[in-house]
């Protein structure tokens, strides 16, 4: 299995990929290094594919990877609805890509980081 180590142990790497994937699903775009973005793109595409399947097993598989973070707070008078990242994946993000077979993200190169000249990129969901 080919993957990037990203200078971390396996548990640190998995935690970082979970965090970045969840942030991308919540916000729609993140700024990170090119190597990280290429790895996050793989995990994000897998999560969106699970969201498109939409069955209970797919929801459980996605729940093991996506962080349990608040994605949105909707206030309607006295009602306050809190939407988690998992709910946003299945209710908002996955239906946007119902007609698309993969390629849910795009990587746009930006400037190099000042401290170590690492190539920074913007990773965003395709509209």
Swiss-Prot record:
GO terms for biological process: translation. InterPro entries: Ribosomal_bL17, Ribosomal_bL17_CS, Ribosomal_bL17_sf. Disulfide bonds: none annotated. Keywords: Ribonucleoprotein, Ribosomal protein. One of its GO terms (cellular component) is cytosolic large ribosomal subunit. Part of the 50S ribosomal subunit. Contacts protein L32. GO terms for molecular function: structural constituent of ribosome. The keyword Transmembrane helix does not apply. PROSITE patterns: RIBOSOMAL_L17. PANTHER family: LARGE RIBOSOMAL SUBUNIT PROTEIN BL17M, RIBOSOMAL PROTEIN L17. The keyword Ribosomal protein applies. This is Large ribosomal subunit protein bL17. Belongs to the bacterial ribosomal protein bL17 family.
